[in-house]
A protein has these predicted regions:
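Solvent-exposed loop/turn and edge beta-strand elements of beta-rich ligand-binding domains
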Residues: 1-198
Length: 198
């Protein structure tokens, strides 16, 4: 309670609301530390931060309102310097007024691995191409597929890159080859994201 005297000047300082953006990072290969994010505000502000070992990055003390524009600030959250093996996640736009009571907004980002496919087209002189077994090995993984009656087998959604962002070389081998055939030599292949290699 203030007791005011006539012609007394009173100064009032407003403390503008501040909030927090919390980023939760997950990845298909489980590597979530040191992922870099940029938060850009519609008021021209810009901040960058990296995730901790748990895949969390927090931007605190962010202004909620643009006083000049008389509106809530829209923040754009982007993952930057995304490593080659991942698809780049879409940026997200948030306002802190849409967050919790304490003006905290949580944004979830997932690193999906770039993947491709291998298509096997089995051919033989007697056209007996169905039910042939192949193994495909690479990056410490082994996959087994079997051809259909048309001699076709497709292995889909396998990683293009390893954790060092190097292209994985896959080795393709035919197994259980009937004795009447000469065993074909192994073949190798590298993949392109979202494409099929024959």
């Amino acid at each position: 309670v203030f007791a005011l005297n006539a012609n007394k000047e009173v100064f009032v300082t407003e403390d503008f609301s501040r909030g927090t953006i919390k980023i939760n990072k997950t990845a298909e290969d489980g590597i979530v530390a040191d992922r870099e994010f940029k938060v850009t505000g519609s008021d021209g502000s810009s901040y960058t931060k990296k995730t901790n070992a748990a895949g969390v990055a927090e931007f605190s003390g962010l202004k909620v309102y643009d006083v000049d524009a008389k509106t809530a600030i829209t923040y754009t959250i982007s993952e930057i310097n995304v490593e080659t093996r991942y698809e780049t996640p879409k940026a997200q736009n948030v306002t802190l007024t849409s967050g919790t009571v304490d003006l905290t907004v949580t944004a979830n980002f997932v690193n999906e691995l770039k993947t491709g496919s291998i298509r096997i087209n089995k051919q033989s002189e007697d056209n007996q191409n169905g039910d042939r077994t192949f193994t495909i090995t690479g990056n410490g993984e082994t996959y087994t597929i079997t051809t259909g009656a048309d001699g076709i087998a497709i292995l889909s959604d396998i990683p293009v890159y390893n954790s060092e962002n190097e292209k994985i070389e896959y080795t393709i081998s035919e197994k259980d080859v009937p004795i009447r055939y000469v065993v074909p030599a192994n073949q190798t292949a590298t993949l392109t994201a979202d494409a099929t290699v024959d």
